[in-house]
Amino acid sequence: MANFIKSINFGYAKDNLLRDTARMAAIESVKFFKNSFVKGGFIDTSLKQWAGKQSPLGGKKLMYGTGALMQSIQKTEETAQRVVVSSDTPYSSLHNDGGIITVTAQMKKFWWAQYYKFAGKTKTTGRGRQSNSAGNRRLNAKAEYCKRMALMKVGSKIKIPQRQFIGESQTLMAELDRQLHTKIAEYWENS
């Protein structure tokens, strides 16, 4: 009866594990940060809800107008030592960190155009007066908001609250640790 000795090439095993875990960490990190948009807040040790919106414009979901911000989250670096996930939209750092923006003449022009767009959509009655329907009240609220924004003075400041969606997360690190231990256990069972 022959004895079979199982030999393991540890260098090869280490390289495979490092490559696989870096790829797994990148995929899971991107998925975790995109999930912030679904949950409406960032999870470090617990969910930190985003500040509510003050604008009547936009849809029901906060920070999800076109989905461009969420879709811009991607891995930018993946090595055995580290994984970097970032967003490349010009306004992502303003939302993630919060900040203050200055009103410009171009912004005022935009808000006036929005005001005229919403104010012109209201429906009238047969006598030419403005209807008091729920749709008109919604449009009037949007038009009034746009007018308030358009009437702000050039140079005045608008505070954008922090709505973090990317950052250090203990929950993410714990999940990556759990998956790494599972991957190592699977590797040793199969080799």
Sequence positions of predicted segments:
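Short, Lys/Arg-rich flexible segments
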Residues: M1-S191
